[in-house]
Design a protein with these regions (language model features):
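Beta1/beta-strand and adjacent pyrophosphate-binding region of the FAD-binding site
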Residues: 1-11, 27
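Extracytoplasmic low-complexity repetitive segments enriched in small/polar residues
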Residues: 9, 22, 164-167
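Gly/Ala-rich phosphate-binding loop of Rossmann-like dinucleotide-binding domains
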Residues: 16, 20
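Glycine-rich FAD pyrophosphate-binding loop
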Residues: 21-42
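Short, ordered loop/turn segments at secondary-structure junctions
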Residues: 31-34, 46, 51, 119
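N-terminal glycine-rich dinucleotide-binding loop that anchors FAD/FMN and/or NAD(P) in oxidoreductases
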Residues: 41-73
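Second-shell loop/turn segments in exported
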Residues: 56-57, 78-95, 145-147
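Conserved redox-cofactor binding core of oxidoreductases
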Residues: 92-173
Length: 173
């Protein structure tokens, strides 16, 4: 393989897909009996903003600069928020903010479906988001392999797995 990806969770699967898109032969190595990591048993809440197509559809104003400000500006912290993340590296936060909307579109292109509801601020702790950014993955019971706890995280992981396999990515479980 040209590329070996360690782990098949919410970071590993997209890495494998992008490498395959670039023409590389890819193998994903996973220590578990199934793909998905912690993401497959998550609630399927995906906090991406910065002007996603979902935000635009529902008239929500957001931008990469606003995402960056929300992640680095201490004056925005809400009373019950977790301020610790504002210690994160500013360059990493800038890169995250600049790629949020592109990441959302990548998930859609990879087959991830989100509930037809406006993004909101549920599914987490009030971190001081000035715009609704929480998207909720959709998964229909019986539509394929599900997580052991039937959580919506499968609505993110299974489409990513299917996309990777369709692009020739091999898995070593």
């Amino acid at each position: 393989a040209d590329v070996v990806v360690i782990g098949s969770g919410a970071a590993g699967l997209p890495a494998a897909i992008k490498a395959a898109d670039g023409g590389a032969s890819v193998i994903v190595v996973e220590t578990n009996y199934d793909v998905g990591g912690h993401a497959i048993i998550s609630g399927g809440n995906v906090p991406l903003g910065g002007g996603t197509s979902a935000q635009k559809k529902y008239g929500i104003q957001d931008s990469p600069d606003t995402v960056f400000s929300d992640l680095t500006d201490w004056t925005i912290v809400q009373a019950n928020g977790w301020p610790d993340f504002r210690y994160n590296d500013r360059e990493v936060m800038r890169a995250f903010a600049d790629h949020c909307a592109l990441t959302y579109e990548f998930l859609l292109e990879s087959g991830v479906q989100f509930k037809e509801v406006p993004p909101d601020n549920q599914g987490g702790h009030n971190l001081g988001n000035s715009a609704p950014r929480e998207n909720h993955a959709f998964w229909t019971k019986g539509a394929g392999y599900e997580s052991p706890n039937n959580r919506a995280g499968t609505g993110v992981i299974r489409p990513l797995e299917n996309s990777a396999r369709a692009k020739g990515v091999k898995f070593l479980l």
